[in-house]
Amino acid sequence: MTRGRVASITGAILLAGTVFAWNAVRQEREFRRLIAAGDAALTRDQTYEAIEAFSGALALKRDSMLAHLKRGDSYRRRGELTAALRDLREATALDPTATRALELLGDVNAAMGRYERAVELYRRYLAIDDRAPQILYKLGLAHYRSGQFTLAVDPVRKSIALDDRFSEAHYLLALCLKAQKHTPEAMASLGRALELNPALGVAREELAALDLAQGKTREGIEQLEALAALEPSRPERLINVGLAYARVGRTDAAVATLGRAAERYPQADVVYEALGRVWLASAEAHDDAVALSKAIQALEAAAARANASSDTLTLYGRALILSGRIQTAERVLQQATTVWPVEPTAFFHLADAAERRGHAAAASDALASYIALSDEEDKEQLTDRLAALSGRKR
């Protein structure tokens, strides 16, 4: 072979190598640009644009763990869990030691209700780094959501040992302890969670419920009042305060609290339903005509709304029966039985109204529906009454 030909071949090889190297550099630059563009889109919460950018990056590097991870996370943020699952599985297959991929894949499985798989993935993460309080918390949460309360306690305690200021972990520990009937310890954990984060509404709500269940009325109502102050946009928070007063017989305080709620949330039907409920209970307990009139006044407007709930209509029907307006009560209670979700006692009170009006067949049908829906253990009296109504309708 002549020297010229050798030189020519060598030059061609060098040129090809240069072109190849340049293309590789250009491809790497474009890959990095697309990754950066996807990250920037995510900071603006533009998940669709992020997915487009990361897909472009994957077109350049199909075996990029990073691009699969980022696209999977983008799908997760959009709620497209099946697509997220696919990408995150690929990311963990490409790099089994990538802890972020393991965490996100665990999160997606947990969001899909696949708690056993989530537990496995969080454990794989912890095998690499066993001092990650957030992952220990997620492991405990996955156990808790799958109903394995005992198994949940250990990882949550370890999470707290690593980060004692992790308020959500203290709250989760309280839920686990409550599920195991360890009420004093649960209340202590809730107290610690609120000490760390006074705005943690779910913990305050749980502590209020436990206080009230333990007969600590003052403490429970104080927690509910604090919750109402923390979440002023939610009328049900102040309603819960009023109903708590009513349950312990403090009708005046209940009415005053619900009156404040009515002033603050004049368009919220749930406020008037609660007021009607309190006044009706007082009317029934004390045969109080004034309380009955106020119950009807509170419930009438709420029941007239097109979207009135079955519960509201049932309360209104009960008040009408008590006031002697049986015909109107029957009509309202018939309507209550057609609204989903149905309040089962609507059928019981409809049977009462229909029977009073001499509509034995309608009363029998309503009572039969109530018996079918009711979870009362002793139904003997009800079945006896049903038999009597069935005999009268023949």
Which positions does each model-derived feature cover?
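Alpha-helical adaptor scaffolds
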Residues: 277-284, 300, 309-324
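Helix-start (N-cap) detector for alpha-helical repeat units in TPR-like alpha-solenoids
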Residues: 31, 65-66, 99-100, 133-134, ...
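Alpha-helical segment of the N-proximal tetratricopeptide repeat
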Residues: 30-60, 70-73, 77, 107-111, ...
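Structural marker of alpha-solenoid helical repeat scaffolds
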Residues: 60, 94, 128, 162, ...
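Structural signature of tandem alpha-helical TPR/SEL1-like repeats
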Residues: 45-53, 77-90, 100, 111-124, ...
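Terminal, low-structured helical/coil segments at or just beyond the last alpha-helical repeat
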Residues: 356, 364-394
